[in-house]
Amino acid sequence: MKEHFSIAIDGPGGAGKSTLAKAVAKKLNILHVDTGAIYRTIGYAAFSRGLDAKDESQIAPLLKEIQIDMAFDETGGQKMLLDGKDVSTEIRLPEISMYASNVSALPCVRAYLLEMQRDIARRRSVIMDGRDIGTVVLPDADLKIYLTASAEE
């Protein structure tokens, strides 16, 4: 029997991936990793330094300068830490969304975070939600869900 298992939830923005993942994680008492929050943290780092989030020549060096960590509270809530500071609120600001979207398209960022996300899944049972989770990040996940929702729902 495997020591750890992984669940991957893919789907478009606004489909309810995080809502479902949080509920399942709570029910199964496993870790929920919101991968979008990790990208938002890099976007926030770029924003706060005045960098062009579309310019890989600016973002690649940033990845070597910053320290990104995750902490989880007693309820399993994910906190994002940037250089030791909790930035969980800041990364949800509307102006950070575009930065997060832009940095997430950069190959250097995707490669940087890919290993981080896979390492988490190697060490613990997890449910991860985000785009490309079941195809790229956790292609061998024990359970893969592609979640969609209509505009009416």
Predicted regions, residues:
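Phosphate-binding P-loop
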Residues: 1-4
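Hydrophobic anchor at the beta1->P-loop junction of P-loop NTPases
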Residues: 7-9
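P-loop (Walker A) phosphate-binding loop of NTP-binding proteins
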Residues: 12
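Conserved glycine(s) of the Walker
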Residues: 16
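Hydrophobic positions on the alpha1 helix immediately C-terminal to the Walker A/P-loop
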Residues: 20
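Post-Walker A helix-loop "phosphate-sensing" segment adjacent to the P-loop in P-loop NTPases
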Residues: 25-34, 48-52
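ATP-dependent small-molecule kinase phosphotransfer cores
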Residues: 37-125, 135-137, 152-153
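Conserved phosphate-donor/acceptor-positioning beta-strand/loop module used by diverse small-molecule
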Residues: 139-153
